[in-house]
């Protein structure tokens, strides 16, 4: 199965994506992860991405889609993949669709995780992030130590996790994502809206039910 995840920051799509990927035995492919891997490996597309980042520019969609195509063509993705953070704009949605057609891989579903804005502010303003591994934590305080990923780092509260910054990010998210949702609706894609308020298990149950996975 090829599944695209959409949703605002703090909606839990990354966590649910990991759980879904484990259940389906497919990789969760996140744009940031594959970009960093391509840059580290020094692939031709990775070098193009690095050049753009070194200039302070956004990495071109064509480069991102090229890297995503390589990831989806890998043996590990033979059974499918969960795509997180891949689609943020309508050109990216169209580019991904064209790429999947070229690969002969159907898009099975687009999961849209929905959460009330006040709940997102509550969640994210209580989030800390490890300076070393960038893993987010909820319910832990700045200054605590993280030992995930084989490294030791300090937990910090990022400036963009302050309430005003969160509301600004939500405004940007709505402006970007509303056209994407409309594009998927017009394209006839299997767009599934998921109520993302509840425990991990409750939200996971809704995802599995929507996808008819037992």
Curated annotation (Swiss-Prot):
EC number: 2.7.4.3
Binding site for ATP: 10-15, 127, 198
Entry GO CC: cytoplasm
UniProt key word Heme: no
Annotated spans, NMP: 30-59
InterPro entries on file: Adenyl_kin_sub (IPR006259), Adenylat/UMP-CMP_kin (IPR000850), P-loop_NTPase (IPR027417)
Pathway info: Purine metabolism; AMP biosynthesis via salvage pathway; AMP from ADP: step 1/1
Pfam families tied to this protein: ADK
Keyword flag Kinase: yes
Chain positions recorded as AMP binding sites: 31, 36, 57-59, 92, 158, 169
CDD domains: ADK
Subcellular location per the Swiss-Prot or TrEMBL entry: Cytoplasm
Region (LID) residue spans: 126-161
One of the GO BP terms on file: AMP salvage
Molecular-function annotations in GO: adenylate kinase activity; ATP binding
Domain comment, as recorded: Consists of three domains, a large central CORE domain and two small peripheral domains, NMPbind and LID, which undergo movements during catalysis. The LID domain closes over the site of phosphoryl transfer upon ATP binding. Assembling and dissambling the active center during each catalytic cycle provides an effective means to prevent ATP hydrolysis.
Binding partners and assembly: Monomer.
Entry function: Catalyzes the reversible transfer of the terminal phosphate group between ATP and AMP. Plays an important role in cellular energy homeostasis and in adenine nucleotide metabolism.
Protein name in the entry: Adenylate kinase
Organism encoding this protein: Gemmatimonas aurantiaca (strain DSM 14586 / JCM 11422 / NBRC 100505 / T-27)
